[in-house]
């Protein structure tokens, strides 16, 4: 995808898809690689080890390229010294590659796409509550560990879990290029499993709960 490389792990013929997009979120990578040893589906793992990927002599956030508007802002944010012509050319490359990449990572037949992320100081579920359609916040859970889902049936199931969960089922007025909005726009069920960096056991538990309870 626009020069951003991914390693693919496939186990069986399940239509379930998993993706890891930020190379500095190593806890999520370990949780996903461990999960794929015993569970069916196809996983896409970015090959870099930093948050921003190398991009034709510059850098780009791999989770802000899934719309033309988001990609344009992303290119401008990280590559301000580029000429207008180069920025336009790089945007055209992303726009050209996006449909094929989405066709590979988005499941068919009502399948589920699961993204795994880790957070650092500051970001937590409370920042998502204002733009969510429903929330289930558990008193004994850390605010930095939570699910974001885009399907109400999935939300109702995950709300019964021990973990925090929010539902975001309406498309944003401003598309920032994140995968969640692209999945929603294509009618694909999407869940993000967000945990603190370093809390591998927590992310494994949340991933296992999802695997056992979402079909």
Where is each model-derived feature located?
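Structured catalytic-domain cores with a bias toward divalent-metal coordination
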Residues: 1-215
């Amino acid at each position: 995808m626009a020069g951003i490389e991914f390693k693919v792990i496939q186990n069986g013929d399940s239509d379930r898809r998993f993706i890891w997009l930020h190379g500095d979120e190593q806890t999520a990578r370990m949780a996903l690689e461990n999960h794929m040893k015993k569970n069916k589906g196809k996983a896409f793992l970015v090959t870099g080890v930093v948050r921003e990927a190398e991009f034709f002599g510059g850098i780009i956030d791999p989770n802000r390229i899934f719309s033309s508007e988001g990609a344009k802002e992303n290119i401008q944010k990280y590559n301000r010294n580029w000429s207008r012509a180069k920025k336009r050319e790089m945007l055209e490359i992303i726009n050209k590659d996006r449909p094929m990449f989405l066709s590979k990572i988005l499941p068919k037949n009502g399948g589920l796409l699961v993204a795994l992320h880790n957070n650092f100081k500051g970001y937590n579920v409370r920042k998502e509550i204002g733009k969510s359609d429903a929330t289930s916040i558990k008193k004994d859970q850390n605010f930095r560990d939570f699910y974001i889902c885009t399907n109400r049936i999935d939300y109702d199931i995950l709300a019964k879990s021990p973990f925090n969960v929010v539902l975001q089922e309406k498309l944003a007025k401003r598309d920032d290029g994140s995968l969640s909005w692209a999945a929603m726009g294509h009618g694909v069920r999407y869940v993000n499993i967000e945990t603190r960096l370093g809390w591998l056991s927590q992310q494994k538990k949340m991933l296992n709960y999802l695997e056992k309870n979402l079909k």
